[in-house]
Amino acid sequence: MTQSDGAASAEPRELVRLSTDALREFRDRERARYEAIKARATPFNLARGKPATEQVALANQLLTAVATPEQCWTEDGNDCRNYYGSPQGLIEVRRLFAAMLGAPPEQVLVANNSSLALMHDALVYALLTGASDGAAPWRDQHRPIRFLCPSPGYDRHFQICEQYGIDMIAVPLTGAGPDMDEVERLAADPAVKGMWCVPKYSNPTGETYSSETVARLARMGAAGDFRLFWDNAYAVHDLTGRSDRLDNVLDACAAAGNPDRALVFGSTSKITFAQAGLGMLATSAANMRWFVSRQSTRTIGPDKLNQLRHVLVLRDDAGISAHMEQQRRLLEPKFAAVQEVFKARLGGTGIAAWTRPRGGYFVSLDVLDACAQRVVALAKGAGIEMVPAGRTFPYGRDPRDRNIRIAPSFPPADEVRAAADALATCVLVATSERLLADRGVNA
């Protein structure tokens, strides 16, 4: 991930350097452009990281992969149409995703569609029964428990904590992961029990945790029942021909003497069918026993037929890579369109900076302080559906009101380009209004 304010145009056009009269004229021109966009009433959706129809169609073989009774049997003789089998999922599917998760198949669990459900369950099990066998439940701590939340981050992580009354502490990101000096300072508090991490192509900033960051997270002082909720949602989701390197956190934790610290999550939600895929957990052998013993009271087992379909269609690491290359080719032009438009419209203005992600599903846009909510409100008025401003921070509160998450994956590339152009207009209107207000010009 790299951050950009775009290349400067031939003449300096930083808005802050314009005279008040020139800035007022600029604002009025952008307002007129905005009204024209509103009049066209073209709806756009940049709200969520939703795969496009063409992307999910790449996995249509899943629809027919298991078509006869004879195909329903596993290599160890289990009928996938019936009850039971390993609570960790088929050994075939655990082998398939072991490399992606960074663990041997024995330390992998493959469940039903949602990795978010696995994160939720792991947190609730720790809250109610302790984070390891014999440990005190988190809820029985003498002080309210706390979670570290690298921000901007994934809103659904934060919603789990909010749902269960877990205090959240925002930690700034650096471009190579969270500010580790701050993380280490905060984690020394025994009331801090966990940390949310999207370590590769982070949502929404696109950054990948550096080797130093992973090593420090693995070895830092923390409560004995502190857990890294390592949501590796974008493990194989590159936008360029070269994948970012992410160190294996399970190996790093084991080497640091904290083998049970990390819970690694993944899914096929943005690989095959977004809501008919597989969720996964990889962790230490002790943690796996802990999780399975609790999960077994919740469910007899996962959808084995769907696991078998994925094995038959994706086959092996090479099959996953080939499939994701097709995904990349569909996504890359959409992200390129956002970059081209922002460079042309916002470059050199001094009022916006945005990421150029090498993978993942988002572009993170920072505007002038106290402007993000106004930008998103203008976007809504122009028919652009966005995630609410502030949603990328704990409790939905961006302390600087500047971050906006952009999800270009779902619309066609031409619509992404038009939406990015309309959004740029909203940014220019909102920020020119703010600069004028700072000069005492409110009309």
Q: Predicted regions span which residues?
A:
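Conserved glycine-rich beta-strand-loop-beta hairpin in the small C-terminal domain of fold type I
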Residues: E325-Q339, I351-D366
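Conserved core segment of the aminotransferase class I/II
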Residues: A111, D251-E332, R345, S432
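N-terminal "arm"/small-domain region of PLP-dependent enzymes with the aminotransferase-like
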Residues: T2-Q88, A98-A99, F226, G381-I384
